Amino acid sequence: MRVKKGFKARRRRNRVLKLAKGFRGRRKNCYRRANQAVERALNYSTRDRRLKRREFRALWIVRINAAARQNGTTYSKLVAALRKAGIEIDRKILADLALALPGDFAAIVKTAQA
């Protein structure tokens, strides 16, 4: 009697089809196309996790620079002054302060320049 590898193969296919949920067209229910689409999506997600960090850092720097210019300095001068004054605040927190609490950000700028 022929034994098919039914359970294992079905489980493998269902795992891929579950990952392809939400895809459009045949990519969501045709195993072969879904497998290719899932593989590509996983590659993109790996790449984009690194890109996300890069893009957020750039966004923080842009926000800090804009707020620093409103307070009469530039980003590079502000970072140098913060380092010289021994104030250790990371860019994410500085950007959040600049956006949410401009008065506190201005106080930090004054402290760094003093």
Curated annotation (Swiss-Prot):
One of its GO terms (cellular component) is ribosome. It comes from the Bacteria. One of its GO terms (molecular function) is rRNA binding. Keywords: Ribonucleoprotein, Ribosomal protein, RNA-binding, rRNA-binding. The keyword Cell wall biogenesis/degradation does not apply. InterPro entries: Ribosomal_bL20, Ribosomal_protein_bL20_C. GO terms for biological process: ribosomal large subunit assembly; translation. Belongs to the bacterial ribosomal protein bL20 family. Binds directly to 23S ribosomal RNA and is necessary for the in vitro assembly process of the 50S ribosomal subunit. It is not involved in the protein synthesizing functions of that subunit. This is Large ribosomal subunit protein bL20. The lineage of its organism: Bacteria, Pseudomonadati, Myxococcota, Myxococcia, Myxococcales.
